[in-house]
């Protein structure tokens, strides 16, 4: 990538040869033209001075529930370490998948010489905490190939992507739609999709044959303490997580390789609990004033890490 000022680097990192990005309007290749991504049909997407580009068109596709405040509270929870075990599991799975990427590519004649470095996409990146941690992790491993991994992250929330892009770096941040991912077919080695909606048909399209999906979903005891408090207050019937639909959705498009469960319980003080309550979807449409929170002094974060391979 081109060196220079942060602004110039924030633009230059979107330059790929051959073209990586695909126009979401006409599906022609998007190439870097000064400070924009532009296709042959002149559809143009400007790159922000903060180092991200929005390829969304039309009205606001963002939910009012996922506003800037939501992502700022989520960032505070991540910074407190409540999700560190999930982040480690995610990074482990991505790193393991990248270790096999060169061998997988060598079996595909048309892609054998297409790219020197592996490519990872965080689909539904939010404010970018998982991708930032993955960026630091890959930069620290004793492997020149992994050090040069091409990192791309997108979310449908422009607010989230604006937060994610703060601080510069090599990650290519985009505001984009899962239903129309702006990447060309067969261009990605690994997709991370963490506590986020999925589009398995699109994932399969952009993954190379043998590419990997790391899908992370809540485990059965995820936020069990808070869910019990909600049930005890009579605001919901028993709240249970089932990942059967997720597994069926993945299996319809990919081959599931393995599933690992990670869990940790963290003590929470009043400030951390406030941040957590403001960022967990469990609290959507729940009146916090109706809850008895005086005895809620810990929260369990449990996740199932599902690794699947594109067929």
Regions found by a protein language model. Give the residues of each.
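Class I SAM-dependent methyltransferase Rossmann-like catalytic core
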Residues: 11, 63-89, 93
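N-terminal auxiliary segments of SAM/dcSAM-dependent transferases
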Residues: 2-64
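Conserved alpha-helix/loop element of class I SAM-dependent methyltransferases that forms part
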Residues: 81-116
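A short glycine-rich, Lys/Arg-flanked "PGG" loop and its adjoining helix->strand segment in the class I
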Residues: 200-214
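Class I SAM-dependent methyltransferase SAM/SAH-binding core
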Residues: 119-180
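A short acidic, Gly/Pro-enriched loop at the edge of an enzyme's catalytic core
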Residues: 179-190
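Conserved Class I S-adenosyl-L-methionine
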Residues: 18-19, 261-311
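Conserved class I S-adenosyl-L-methionine
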Residues: 212-244
């Amino acid at each position: 990538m081109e060196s220079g000022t942060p602004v110039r680097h924030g633009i230059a990192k979107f330059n790929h040869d051959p073209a990586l990005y695909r126009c979401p309007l006409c599906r022609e290749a998007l190439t870097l033209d000064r400070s924009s991504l532009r296709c042959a049909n002149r559809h143009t997407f400007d790159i922000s001075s903060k180092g991200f580009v929005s390829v969304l068109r039309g009205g606001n596709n963002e939910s009012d529930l996922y506003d800037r405040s939501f992502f700022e509270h989520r960032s505070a929870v991540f910074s407190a370490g409540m999700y560190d075990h999930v982040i480690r599991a995610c990074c482990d799975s991505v790193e393991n998948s990248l270790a096999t990427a060169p061998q997988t590519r060598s079996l595909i004649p048309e892609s054998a010489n297409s790219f020197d470095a592996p490519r990872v996409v965080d689909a539904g990146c939010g404010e970018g905490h998982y991708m930032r941690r993955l960026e630091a992790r890959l930069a620290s491993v004793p492997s020149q190939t992994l050090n040069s991994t091409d990192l791309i992250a997108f979310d449908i929330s422009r607010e989230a992507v604006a937060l994610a892009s703060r601080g510069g770096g090599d990650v290519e941040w985009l505001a984009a739609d899962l239903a129309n991912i702006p990447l060309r077919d067969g261009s990605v080695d690994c997709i991370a999709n963490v506590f986020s909606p999925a589009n398995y048909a699109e994932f399969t399209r952009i993954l190379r044959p043998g590419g990997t999906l790391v899908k992370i979903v809540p485990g059965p005891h995820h936020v069990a303490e808070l869910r019990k408090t909600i049930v005890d207050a009579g605001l919901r019937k028993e709240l249970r997580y089932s990942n059967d639909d997720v597994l069926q959705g993945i299996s319809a498009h990919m081959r599931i390789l393995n599933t690992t469960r990670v869990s940790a319980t963290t003590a929470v003080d009043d400030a951390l609990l406030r941040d957590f309550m403001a960022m967990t979807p469990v609290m959507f449409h729940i009146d916090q004033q109706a809850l008895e929170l005086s005895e809620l002094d810990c929260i369990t974060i449990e996740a199932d890490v599902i690794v699947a391979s594109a067929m």
